[in-house]
């Protein structure tokens, strides 16, 4: 693996970690160049095990021994030969990494990964029995927490509405502890249709699509007449300020 030592985050090779905004990382106009950032060794490992393609790593040197086996696996899967070009691994001072992340980076490293193309709804629902649908969740921390809960509860897949915040946003990935790479997910509904009154909503076609796949749609609420999701079920979680 090539080790690249940098003294400052101003190095242009670290743009993906230090300067690109989330919108720039997503690169909608050039999706083949889109990236996302994973923080901590555990999340990086889960991203890799979830089939994500690593582009480069950034860490403090003391974490290299614990990361080395994972880096070796990354290079092996990419067909990189030992002693060859390898996966770029940037080494930065502790203070610079703390300044970048905004907190004490006690769990190792950051990884830049290629953002994958989203699967179709049909692909995600294949063999799924319990699905969570996130409608317009507009808080990245909540998105990550819901994915973590979904993984713990055995949810088979997650569908997110067009206006729901991005599950691959850096904070969402971190809060999810990498479960966004373990639970299959995709977008449902037409992203080009504004999700506001009078302009149509994702549910016009999205709910029908779920019904076509045999799912019963149920809102998540405390109620005496609540159902038990014994059959194919899609649990709908609305945005934080929704009522009714």
Provide a role label for each language-model segment.
Residues 229-244:
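A contiguous loop/helix-start segment that scaffolds small-molecule binding in enzyme catalytic cores
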Residues 32-35, 53-56, 86-88, 157-158, ...:
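Short active-site oxyanion
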């Amino acid at each position: 693996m090539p080790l690249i030592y940098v003294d400052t985050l101003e190095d242009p090779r670290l743009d993906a970690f230090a300067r690109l905004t989330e919108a720039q990382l997503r690169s909608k106009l050039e999706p083949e160049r889109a990236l996302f950032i994973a923080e901590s060794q555990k999340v990086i490992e889960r991203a890799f095990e979830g089939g994500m393609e690593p582009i480069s790593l950034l860490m403090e040197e003391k974490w290299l021994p614990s990361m080395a086996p994972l880096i070796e696996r990354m290079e092996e899967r990419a067909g990189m030969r030992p002693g060859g070009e390898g996966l770029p691994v940037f080494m930065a001072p502790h203070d610079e990494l703390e300044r970048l992340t905004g907190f004490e980076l006690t769990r190792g490293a950051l990884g830049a990964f290629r953002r994958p193309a989203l699967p179709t709804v049909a692909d995600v629902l294949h063999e799924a029995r319990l699905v969570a649908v996130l409608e317009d969740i507009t808080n990245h921390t909540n998105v990550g927490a819901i994915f973590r809960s979904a993984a713990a509860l055995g949810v088979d897949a997650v569908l997110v509405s067009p206006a729901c915040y991005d599950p691959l946003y850096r904070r969402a990935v971190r809060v999810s502890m990498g479960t966004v790479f373990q639970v299959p997910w995709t977008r449902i509904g037409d992203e080009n249709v504004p999700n506001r009154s009078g302009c149509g909503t994702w549910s016009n076609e999205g709910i029908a699509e779920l019904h076509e796949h045999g799912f019963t749609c149920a809102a998540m609420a405390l109620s005496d007449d609540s159902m038990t999701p014994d059959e194919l079920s899609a649990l709908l979680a609305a945005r934080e300020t929704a009522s009714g």
